[in-house]
Amino acid sequence: MENRNTFSWVKEQMTRSISVSIMIYVITRTSISNAYPIFAQQGYENPREATGRIVCANCHLANKPVDIEVPQAVLPDTVFEAVLRIPYDMQLKQVLANGKKGGLNVGAVLILPEGFELAPPDRISPELKEKIGNLSFQSYRPNKKNILVIGPVPGKKYSEIVFPILSPDPAMKKDVHFLKYPIYVGGNRGRGQIYPDGSKSNNTVYNATSTGVVRKILRKEKGGYEISIVDASDGRQVIDLIPPGPELLVSEGESIKLDQPLTSNPNVGGFGQGDAEIVLQDPLRVQGLLFFFASVILAQVFLVLKKKQFEKVQLYEMNF
């Protein structure tokens, strides 16, 4: 009896451990496969290449627009908004990893000048917190606080992303100066077409790997197709695998050529990048400018008063 209870307890513990392991694997795998910024973080030390191209474009092949809006100038140690807009047709549906259709997600990378960083929560005003919503930003690297990533997040809710940014203070950071700085941004809507290892996702076109005749099209049980192509010249058979998602454009008995599209292009998203400029303004320069404007206004006032006084003197002399 005691041995039976011991066996039951061991069996229960093993089952629980296996279940927990499976849950952890699924959660981890899902988060990595869906989160495009993680791909960039894992594969590239810097998201912006020397050519100016942001590396996210290596996986998101379609070119789409983005828009970045920042203040023209900011003072040191000041929180300001950087607003990224990722426009797209909200009615569109994308092909998900399982081949079904679903809403588009969005993601972004913001490359700030050295010294600029994400504003700490205690410096963000309630109004700005409301604009940000439930978004959670993270640094590209622990030592690159000026590069921020976000996503994937639902596109219908966050096609406009507000970044809370804290400007640096040159008095505290000697490598920061009062200058005009560039800001770079990249934003995507929808899934990519290529994974970092070079393999295709199911959100792209699949082409024939051989010239020949489509001998057989087998629909797989879990979705997708297995296409047998026979080369008419030597009888060699090639099998092309199509994952769930793309729609077939060929049929059995059809003659095809090398690199001919076997499927439609299911991709409705894309990636875009842009840039803006911001001036880190010296407060003393602003004060000097205000003093100059005040001096000009006072000079104008005194000039008008002097003119009025001169006109009165002239009028007095004419009366005599």
Swiss-Prot record:
Q: Which GO terms describe its cellular component?
A: chloroplast thylakoid membrane; plastid
Cofactor stoichiometry and binding? Binds 1 heme group covalently.
- Named cofactor requirement(s): heme
Mention one GO biological process in which this protein takes part, according to its record: photosynthesis
Q: Where does heme bind?
A: Y36, C56, C59, H60
Keywords of the record? Chloroplast, Electron transport, Heme, Iron, Membrane, Metal-binding, Photosynthesis, Plastid, Signal, Thylakoid, Transmembrane, Transmembrane helix, Transport
How is this protein organized at the quaternary level?
The 4 large subunits of the cytochrome b6-f complex are cytochrome b6, subunit IV (17 kDa polypeptide, petD), cytochrome f and the Rieske protein, while the 4 small subunits are PetG, PetL, PetM and PetN. The complex functions as a dimer.
Native source organism of the sequence:
Oryza sativa subsp. indica (Rice)
Q: Which GO terms describe its molecular function?
A: electron transfer activity; heme binding; iron ion binding
Task: Give the family, as the similarity comment puts it.
Answer: Belongs to the cytochrome f family.
Q: Which Gene3D superfamilies match?
A: 2.40.50.100, Cytochrome f large domain, Single helix bin
Membrane-spanning ranges: 286-305
Q: Please state the span of the N-terminal signal peptide per the UniProt entry.
A: 1-35
Q: What is the protein name given in its UniProt record?
A: Cytochrome f
Places the protein is found: Plastid, Chloroplast thylakoid membrane
